[in-house]
C-alpha cells in the first residue's frame, strides 16, 4: 500500500515539475536546448494514431505488392497530418476549448448530438483495430489463444490509463516509451532486411503510380492520414496543459507546439516509411501477395529468422496497446466535450472493448472486422475535419490567431483530397466500380 502511495506521489511530482519547467520557459527563466523538453508530450501521444495496427497492415500491403514505389505517398500523407494536428493543437491553446466543446457551444443541439454519436462510434472503431492488433501480436508471440491475448491487452491498457490520475506527465512518458519501442523495432528490422537504399531515396521523391491498382493502395494510406479521434484528442491535450497568462506566452506555446508536432509526426512518418521499406525488402520479390499481419509474421520467420519475426510482433504489441490507450483517452474527451458527461474509466474501457470481444466471440473474420473499422473511420472524418477548419479560420473563435489565407487554402485543398480518397476507399470496400479505377 505504501509503495502504491509513493508511486502515485512520485508520478504527480513529475507532472508538477513539468508544469513548473514550462512556466520557467514562458517567463524566460529557462533557456537552451533543454527548454524544448517540457513541451514534449501532446504530439507524442497523438502520433500513436499514425502508427496503429491499421497503418501497419496498409504499409505491409504497399511494400509487399509495390516495393518502394509508394514511399512518396507516405511522405506526403505525413505532411498533411502535421498540418491538421498543428491546427488542432492551436485550437486548444488559443481558445482553451477542445474541438468537441466548441462543436457543442457553436452548433445546434441536434447537430452536436449527431456529431457526438458518430464520433463515439469512430472512437470505438479505432479501438477495435488497435485492440485486436495488440491481441494478435500477443497471441502469436506467446502462442496463446486470441481471447487470451485480448485479456492481457485489456489489463495492460487499463493499467496505463490509470496513470492519468497522477497527472498528464506519467502517461505521456509511458506512451513515449511505447513509441520508442516501435521505432527501435523497425530500426532493427532495417538492419536485418536487405534494402536497396538508392531505390528508397529515388521513390521517396518520385511521385508516380506503377499501375492503376497502386492507386487503391495509396487511397488506403492517405485515407488513414487524418484520424477523427486524433483531431479531438490533440485539442484536448493542449487546452489546459499549461494555460497562457499573456499573449506573449500564448505565442511561445504555439511555437513550441508546432516544433513538437513536426518532430513527433516526423518520427511517426519515418516509422511508417520503415514499415513499407521492411515489407518491400522482405516480401516484394517472392511474396508480393502478403497483405495481412498474421501472414507477414509467418512469412517473415523463415525468410529473415525468428528474431526478425519476434521484433515485428513486439512492435505490433506496442502499437496496439498504445493506440488502444490513446483511443480511450479520445473517447473520454469526446463525451465530456459534447455532452458534458464523464463515466468511470473502467466503464469507458469496457464499452470500447466490447466490439472487439464480440468480433472474436461471434467468430467474425478479424481481417474483415478491421476493414470495416477503417470504413467507419472514413465515414466519421468529414464532420470533425470541417469543424476544425471552420473554427481555426474564424476570427470570432481564434481572434488574431485565425489561419492565414495561405494556410487556409492549403488546409482546405488537403482536406478535400483526403475526403475524396476516403470516399474512394468506402466505395471500393462495398464493391462499387469507379471509372478509371480497377474494380
Curated annotation (Swiss-Prot):
Keywords: Cell inner membrane, Cell membrane, Ion transport, Membrane, Symport, Transmembrane, Transmembrane helix, Transport
Record localization: Cell inner membrane
GO molecular function: cadmium ion transmembrane transporter activity; manganese ion transmembrane transporter activity; metal ion binding; symporter activity
Membrane topology label: Multi-pass membrane protein
GO cellular component terms listed in the entry, alphabetical order: plasma membrane
Transcription is among the record's keywords: no
InterPro entries: NRAMP_fam
GO biological process annotation, one example: iron ion transmembrane transport
Principal cellular location given in the protein's record: membrane
Entry's transmembrane regions: 32-52, 67-87, 121-141, 144-164, 173-193, 214-234, 261-281, 301-321, 350-370, 371-391, 406-426
Physiological role: H(+)-stimulated, divalent metal cation uptake system.
Record-stated family: Belongs to the NRAMP family.
NCBIfam families: nramp, Nramp_1, PRK00701.1
Name assigned to this protein: Divalent metal cation transporter MntH
Organism for this UniProt entry: Verminephrobacter eiseniae (strain EF01-2)
Amino acid at each position: 500500500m505504501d509503495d502504491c502511495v509513493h508511486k502515485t506521489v512520485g508520478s504527480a511530482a513529475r507532472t508538477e515539475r513539468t508544469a513548473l519547467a514550462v512556466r520557467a520557459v514562458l517567463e524566460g527563466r529557462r533557456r537552451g536546448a533543454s527548454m524544448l523538453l517540457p513541451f514534449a508530450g501532446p504530439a507524442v501521444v497523438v502520433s500513436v494514431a499514425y502508427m496503429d495496427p491499421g497503418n501497419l497492415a496498409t504499409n505491409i500491403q504497399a511494400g509487399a505488392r509495390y516495393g518502394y514505389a509508394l514511399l512518396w505517398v507516405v511522405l506526403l500523407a505525413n505532411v498533411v497530418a502535421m498540418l491538421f494536428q498543428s491546427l488542432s493543437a492551436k485550437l486548444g491553446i488559443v481558445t482553451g476549448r477542445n474541438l468537441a466543446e466548441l462543436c457543442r457551444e457553436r452548433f445546434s443541439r441536434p447537430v452536436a448530438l449527431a456529431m457526438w454519436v458518430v464520433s463515439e462510434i469512430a472512437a470505438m472503431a479505432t479501438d477495435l483495430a488497435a485492440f485486436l492488433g495488440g491481441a494478435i501480436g500477443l497471441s502469436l508471440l506467446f502462442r496463446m489463444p486470441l481471447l487470451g491475448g485480448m485479456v492481457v491487452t485489456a489489463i495492460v491498457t487499463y493499467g496505463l490509463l490509470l496513470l492519468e490520475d497522477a497527472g498528464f506527465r506519467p502517461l505521456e512518458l509511458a506512451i513515449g516509451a511505447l513509441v520508442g519501442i516501435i521505432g527501435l523495432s523497425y530500426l532493427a528490422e532495417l538492419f536485418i532486411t536487405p534494402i536497396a537504399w538508392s531505390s528508397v531515396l529515388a521513390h521517396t521523391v518520385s511521385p508516380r503510380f506503377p499501375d492503376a491498382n497502386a492507386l487503391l493502395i495509396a487511397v488506403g494510406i492517405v485515407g488513414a492520414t487524418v484520424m477523427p479521434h486524433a483531431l479531438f484528442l490533440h485539442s484536448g491535450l493542449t487546452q489546459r496543459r499549461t494555460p497562457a497568462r499573456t499573449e506573449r506566452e500564448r505565442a511561445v506555446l504555439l511555437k513550441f507546439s508546432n516544433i513538437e508536432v513536426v518532430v513527433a509526426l516526423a518520427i511517426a512518418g519515418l516509422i511508417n516509411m520503415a514499415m513499407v521499406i521492411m515489407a518491400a525488402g522482405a516480401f516484394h520479390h517472392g511474396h508480393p501477395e502478403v497483405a495481412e499481419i498474421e501472414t507477414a509474421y509467418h512469412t517473415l520467420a523463415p525468410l529473415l529468422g525468428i528474431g526478425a519475426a519476434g521484433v515485428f510482433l513486439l512492435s505490433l504489441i506496442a502499437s496496439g496497446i498504445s493506440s488502444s490507450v490513446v483511443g480511450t483517452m479520445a473517447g473520454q474527451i469526446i463525451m465530456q466535450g459534447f455532452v458534458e458527461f464523464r463515466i468511470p474509466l473502467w466503464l469507458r474501457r469496457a464499452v470500447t472493448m466490447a466490439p472487439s470481444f464480440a468480433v472474436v466471440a461471434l467468430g467474425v473474420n478479424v481481417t474483415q472486422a478491421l476493414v470495416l473499422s477503417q470504413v467507419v473511420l472514413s465515414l466519421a472524418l468529414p464532420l470533425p475535419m470541417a469543424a476544425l477548419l471552420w473554427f481555426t479560420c474564424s476570427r470570432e473563435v481564434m481572434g488574431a490567431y485565425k489561419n492565414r489565407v495561405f494556410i487556409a487554402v492549403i488546409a482546405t485543398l488537403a482536406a478535400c483530397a483526403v475526403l475524396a480518397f476516403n470516399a474512394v476507399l468506402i466505395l471500393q470496400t462495398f464493391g462499387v466500380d469507379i471509372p478509371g479505377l480497377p474494380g
